[in-house]
Structure formats: C-alpha cells, structure tokens
Amino acid sequence: RDLTDISLLECFIHLRYVDLSENKLQDLSPLSSLTHLLWLKVDGNLLTSARMQELPYLQIISFAHNHIKDMEGITHPRLANLSLKGNKIQTALGLSQALFSLHDLELRGNKLESTAGFNLPKLKNLYLAQNAIRSLEGLEALEQLTTLHLRDNQLETLDGFCSSMKCLQYLNLRNNGISNFQEVAKLQVLPMLQALVLLDNPCSDEPNYRLEVLILLPHLERLDKESVEQDERAEANEIRQKRQEEEK
C-alpha cells in the first residue's frame, strides 16, 4: 500500500499479529506501544535498522529484504524466530546476548564475512547461506545448535568447529572452496554430525570422494543428497582399519 507512516497503530495497543510487508516504511517506533505483540512481519520495506523498543511478548519477527546494515538493538526477551534474510548486514557483532529464547536465526543473502558474534547458547537453527563468509569464529558458544547452513560462501578452511557443538546434526557447506580432505577431517570434532553436504566444493571432484569422506566421518548417515549405504560404510571401515595398521 506504499505506507510511509504507521502512527495510527499506536492506538491499537492490544494487537497481537501485525503484517506491514511491501510498504515504504523507514520507522517502526509507533509499534513500541503494542506491548502485547506476538508476531511482526515487515518484509520488503526501506528499513535501515532493526532497532526497536523491547517488546516483552514478541516471539517472531521477519525483517526480510530491507536495507538493514547491523544487528544492534534487537532485545526482545521472548524472541524465538528472527529473519533478516536479504539485507546488507556485514557483521553479527552487536547481536544482543539477551536473546535468551532465540531458536531460529535466518541471515541468508547478506554480506557477512565471518561467524563472529553469534553468542546465542539456545540457538538451534542458523541459516547463513549466500554471504561472503571466509572464516569461522565464535562457534564454541553454539552448544545447542542442530542445523547450520553455510552454502554459497567463501570458506577454504574448516577451522573453527569445536567439540562444544555437541548437538550439531546437519551441516551444509555446498559451493564453498574446500579443496582437500584434511579440511573435512576437522569435522571429526562434531560428535553428533549425521548429515553433511559438500557438493560443488573442489574436494567433491576428487576420485573416491564419498569413500574418503566416510573414512574420515564414519558416523555420517547422509552425504549430500544420498543416504550412506551399508556396503559403503563397510568398505570405508575396512580401508580405515588398514590405514591405521599401516601407520603403526
């Protein structure tokens, strides 16, 4: 509707669900009086900041496809699901550690160069595809993370994963720059990893690629789009044992 002014909403203090997508909003301050708000969608506006006055019951926000450049000023204590997809965010530093309830964070299609700043111990799903991430930093705080999407980034090394990420089950690294299996071996620190996507990395063109990954990561249940077959697993175990004996 090409709205630029939502000051009228200040009167409707009991609103729970508000969708203001596809307008021309630059200012959300009138929403600060909506203290009962549970759900807010403001996709496709002209917002340059996600900063808002703290709303005590707000659980879901989508700021997708705006012009937001940082993650400061998001402090809603019950926020569980936050989408900032398709903005211009360059760093997660400034993300409030007071987001105690945040489970899902969507940041696809931004300009992140690092994973530093995601100090969110309750986070379960983190979507970072289509950024410019070159380095993995600060992941040790993500102890409850189960899903991590890093597709279409610029990773050449896999330093940064650590054993404190004891719940991570699904990792998507498709279309990065992982060129050798020594980097894949660094994923051995992830005790619960079950599904891994490595398609469109240089290492996926190596001969016996699937076998080499399974030798390094014997607990995988799915590699790329296919489940790990029993005979594949047996062959990988056999080669691993032979190599271990040769090293002795």
Predicted regions and their residues:
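Consensus "Asn ladder" position of solenoid repeat domains
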Residues: 1, 23, 45, 66, ...
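Conserved hydrophobic beta-strand positions in leucine-rich repeat
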Residues: 15-20, 37-42, 59-63, 80-84, ...
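Contiguous hydrophobic segments
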Residues: 59-67, 72, 80-81, 85, ...
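Leucine-rich repeat domain C-terminal region
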Residues: 73, 91-94, 113, 134, ...
